[in-house]
Amino acid sequence: MNTLKKYRKLYDLNLSYQRTSNAVATERTYNPTTGGYVTHPVNVNGNWRTDGTFSTNGQFGTNKAFDWSSHSSFSYDHNVDMANVVGSTTHELSTIGSLYLRERLSVNYSQRGWHLGAKVQGSYNRMTGRRSDFKEISAWDYSYGLTARL
């Protein structure tokens, strides 16, 4: 009886969370008498980050000539800092959220020392903030291609 499997699969999952307490920010206050700014360090809380990845890959087909892989990842940053709003003489807390998503896929065929493959990857970034003068950012990026080794 032949017990050799015709395919192989691997999985990998990673998750993490980091939090910063008492981060040092620079507070800047406008002095209308002198026309300058007074700066000094202050502690802020609320900075944290979470991220993760999930990867899987495998082989299939006769002599495991085909292989495929998928790699997904995300991260979210919650950043708190001090900010000056244009026209204001005081400062305020500024909170920015940054989301990053990414996916990468590939399929390959190998036989007798030569190799053909296809790959595609894409990412999405989004930054949001609650300040009235903050402009939200949403951006997509993608790439694709073929590979060969003869």
PLM-predicted stretches and their roles:
Residues 1-150:
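Exposed, low-structure sequence patches enriched in small/polar residues
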